[in-house]
Structure formats: structure tokens, C-alpha cells
């Protein structure tokens, strides 16, 4: 086994799959999580339960690892910055400062000369009234929120009358487009413009939660080239190391927009485990550990189904064929809209 030990902040399914990616390379892992029942602890070599603001526990974690990464981007910046003073954090904490805040993220993308949907900062009710041209639109909290949380759909101006939100938080209003398709580009950057880029993954959402992902995506070649170029520009401008996901919209006129950046491994990339020679998870570990880039090869076309809430019960009792791969996240409690597992179906022959 390698002498290297990676610390992973966060103990959900992405943490579990990162641990498995590290295990493929004989690299040890320590999970730090604020959930004592974190499912990733089963796959790690060691587990530390503690709050992300608990300095004493964080210092104990620092002593046990050689470098640190994370499975989700909403770790407090101060915690990442503290860790980075003693053990290198990859991707670097400064990146999180941008992508933790939706307005900063959109501003960054536009400064790269890359298109997003129209948007405006909202700090008070009068800002909404002054920007009705962006309605229909989505009002989102600038911080936190995922899978539709912290988002308010404004179909028309009259919806403003029924809006009851806390303006002590910052918001962003994004103009809705005539959506044709959503897809993601997952890229692993090894530094110095050395990239491994996975082919576009077409995504479908239900109730603002990812439900289906598939490769190949049914997307025009010109859009594919542009999307890969944009993802590479974003990764290079951030001086990113590791796996990153850029999510895209295509409108009815075939215009391309960046929706958001995920500075980590991504749900849509679960299918890379069974469809590529190297998964997004293993590639992330390779990059942050300074290992050389290996040639990426797609072996199979594939479809991934997210298993949400109570759906997991029936999936646990099913029998699967040799082209189906079921992954149960091992979460202790079943909750509505909670991602409980996934099924990947590969197309052989």
C-alpha cells in the first residue's frame, strides 16, 4: 500500500466513491464528516466525526493526512484555509470562494468571455421590481442550496406579490431560457493545461434533481467542441487541480450557456465508473496526488439512473444482469428527494 494518505472532507456517496478510486491506486483515505452515520466511513481507512468549524478536531484530522480534498463545495472557506496552511488542499480554497457564491461564479465565467444566462444581484425587494425584464426567471440564494433548494421560480410579475423571503441573504435572479437540453462536461486537470476530458453527458432532471444521465449525448459536434473548450478555459483560469464539472444549457436556438461549475467529482459522472477505463473519481485522486495522466478510453456507452427516496427499497430486492451495476449508498435514513443509490446500465457490443 502507498505511504500516501488523503483526507476527504465530506462522507456522502461522492466521498465513498473517492475512497474506492483511491483504493484502486493503493492510497489510504481518512474521511472527516459532521454526520456520525456518514456512509463513506465504510470505504475509508479511518473516519473522524466532527463539525467543520471544530478547530481541535480539524487539527487532529490534519495530523493524520498528507493532503486534503473534498466531496462538496460548501465546506467553510475558513476551514479550508486553515487546513491549507499545514497540508495542501486540492482544489485550492480560493476556488471555493468563487463557486460557493452564485453571483461571483457567474461574474467569473463572464470574465472568461463565456456565456451564461442573463442575471442580476438581488439585495432587496426593490431590486426585483427594477428587473422584471428578467422574469420569467429563477431567484436563487447566492450561497448554499442544491437540487432545487433555495430556489424560487418566478413565472410572471404577479408571483412577486406572493414571494416571502428573507432579504438578509443575498440572491441572484437568473433569466429563464427556452431550454432544449442540459448536459455536463467532466474534466480532470493535472496542471499546466494537461486535461483528461470525458465526452459530454446528457442529463435529465425531475423536480430539479438529476434523474438520468447518458452517453453518448445527442448534441451537435460544434456545441461539443465549444463546451469542451469552455470547460478547459475555466479549469485553466482557476488553476484547478482535480476533477471538475461544468454544467451547460442549450436553448431552442442552439445557443450554449454555462449553468454552473461544480469544483469536484459530479453525480452525472457516476457512469464513468463502468463505462471508462478510468473513472472521474480515480482521475481526481491521480491528479491531486501528482500522478501522471493516463490515456482516457471509453469502453461502453451507458445510462445512469439516480435512485431517489423510497425507490431504493425495490432496487435493493431486484436481480441484475451482467450489464447492470447497482450501487447502494448505504444511507441510514430514507428521506424524500434524497439520493439513495444509482444504477448504471452499460451497452455491450
For the regions a language model picked out, list residue spans one by one.
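ATP-binding N-terminal substructure of ATP-dependent carboxylate-amine bond-forming enzymes
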Residues: 1-95, 99-100, 104
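Protein kinase-like catalytic core scaffold
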Residues: 196, 244, 256-260
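Active-site "cap" helix and flanking loop/linker of ATP-utilizing ligase/carboxylase catalytic domains
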Residues: 225-246, 252, 262-310
Amino acid at each position: 500500500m502507498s505511504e500516501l494518505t488523503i483526507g476527504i472532507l465530506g462522507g456522502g456517496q461522492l466521498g465513498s466513491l473517492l475512497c474506492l478510486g483511491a483504493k484502486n491506486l493503493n492510497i489510504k483515505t481518512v474521511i472527516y464528516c459532521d454526520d456520525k452515520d456518514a456512509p463513506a466511513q465504510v470505504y475509508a481507512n479511518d473516519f473522524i466525526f466532527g463539525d467543520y468549524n471544530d478547530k481541535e478536531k480539524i487539527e487532529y484530522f490534519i495530523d493524520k493526512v498528507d493532503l486534503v480534498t473534498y466531496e462538496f463545495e460548501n465546506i467553510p472557506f475558513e476551514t479550508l484555509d486553515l487546513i491549507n496552511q499545514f497540508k495542501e488542499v486540492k482544489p485550492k480554497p480560493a476556488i471555493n470562494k468563487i463557486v460557493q457564491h452564485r453571483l461571483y461564479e457567474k461574474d467569473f465565467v463572464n470574465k472568461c468571455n463565456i456565456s451564461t444566462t442573463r442575471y442580476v444581484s438581488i439585495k432587496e425587494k426593490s431590486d426585483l421590481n427594477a428587473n422584471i425584464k428578467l422574469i420569467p426567471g429563477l431567484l436563487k440564494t447566492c450561497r448554499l442550496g442544491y437540487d432545487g433548494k433555495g430556489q424560487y421560480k418566478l413565472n410572471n410579475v404577479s408571483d412577486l406579490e406572493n414571494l416571502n423571503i428573507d432579504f438578509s441573504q443575498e440572491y441572484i435572479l437568473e433569466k429563464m431560457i427556452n431550454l432544449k437540453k442540459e448536459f455536463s462536461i467532466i474534466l480532470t486537470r493535472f496542471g499546466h493545461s494537461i486535461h483528461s476530458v470525458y465526452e459530454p453527458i446528457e442529463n435529465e432532471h425531475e423536480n430539479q434533481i438529476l434523474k438520468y444521465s447518458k452517453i453518448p449525448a445527442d448534441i451537435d459536434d460544434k456545441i461539443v467542441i465549444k463546451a469542451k473548450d469552455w470547460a478547459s478555459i475555466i479549469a485553466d483560469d482557476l488553476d484547478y487541480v482535480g476533477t471538475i464539472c461544468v454544467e451547460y444549457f442549450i436553448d431552442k436556438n442552439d445557443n450554449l450557456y454555462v449553468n454552473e461549475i461544480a469544483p469536484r467529482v459530479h453525480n452525472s459522472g457516476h457512469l464513468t465508473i463502468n463505462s471508462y477505463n478510468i473513472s472521474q473519481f480515480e482521475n481526481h485522486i491521480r491528479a491531486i496526488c501528482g500522478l501522471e495522466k493516463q490515456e482516457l478510453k471509453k469502453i461502453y456507452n451507458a445510462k445512469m439512473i439516480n435512485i431517489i427516496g423510497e425507490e431504493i427499497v425495490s432496487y435493493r430486492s431486484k436481480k441484475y444482469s451482467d450489464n447492470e451495476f447497482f450501487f447502494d449508498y448505504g444511507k441510514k435514513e430514507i428521506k424524500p428527494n434524497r439520493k439513495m443509490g444509482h444504477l448504471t446500465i452499460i451497452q455491450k457490443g
